[in-house]
Amino acid sequence: MATDTTEVKAIARFIRMSPYKVRRVLDQIRGLSYREALIILEFMPYRATEPVLTLLRSAAANAEHNAGLDRAELVITQAYADQGPVLKRFQPRAQGRAYQIRKPTCHITLAVAANAGAK
C-alpha cells in the first residue's frame, strides 16, 4: 500500500532577489511536469526566472544522476522560496543624512519526483 516515490531536491541559497518576486514565478510551475515548466520559464518576462530555470535543470540532473529517474517523467512536487539574510546598505543624502537600503536575499527550493501515472 505504501508508494515508493523518490523525491529529489535542489536548493539555491543566497539569491540576490526578493522572495516575493521569486514566489510569483514558483506559483506558476508548481505541480507541472519538467518539460512544461521549462517551456513556461523560457517565455516568462521576469528576472526571477533565471535562477529558477537554473535550479530546475539542476534538480532534473540530480534526479537523473543520483536517483536514476527519467527527465521526461519528472513532476515538480515542491517549489518554495524562503527569506534569506538582508544586506543593509546606505544611500548618502543631502546635509549629511543617509537612507538605509535593504537588499533582500532568498533561498529557493525545488523538489521533483517521478510521475506516478506516467503515460
From Swiss-Prot:
InterPro entries per the UniProt record, alphabetical:
Ribosomal_uL22, Ribosomal_uL22_bac/chlpt-type, Ribosomal_uL22_bac/org-type, Ribosomal_uL22_CS, Ribosomal_uL22_sf
Q: Record's PROSITE patterns?
A: RIBOSOMAL_L22
Output the SUPFAM superfamilies linked to this UniProt entry.
Ribosomal protein L22 (SSF54843)
Q: Which GO terms describe its biological process?
A: translation
Report the Pfam families cross-referenced here: Ribosomal_L22 (PF00237)
Q: Which GO terms describe its molecular function?
A: rRNA binding; structural constituent of ribosome
Q: Which UniProt keywords apply?
A: Ribonucleoprotein, Ribosomal protein, RNA-binding, rRNA-binding
Top-level taxon of origin = Bacteria
A GO cellular component annotation in the UniProt record: cytosolic large ribosomal subunit
| Subunit-structure text | Part of the 50S ribosomal subunit.
Family (UniProt): Belongs to the universal ribosomal protein uL22 family.
Q: What does this protein do?
A: This protein binds specifically to 23S rRNA; its binding is stimulated by other ribosomal proteins, e.g. L4, L17, and L20. It is important during the early stages of 50S assembly. It makes multiple contacts with different domains of the 23S rRNA in the assembled 50S subunit and ribosome.
Q: What is the designated name of this protein? A: Large ribosomal subunit protein uL22
Organism of this sequence = Nostoc sp. (strain PCC 7120 / SAG 25.82 / UTEX 2576)
Q: What is the primary gene name for this protein? A: rplV
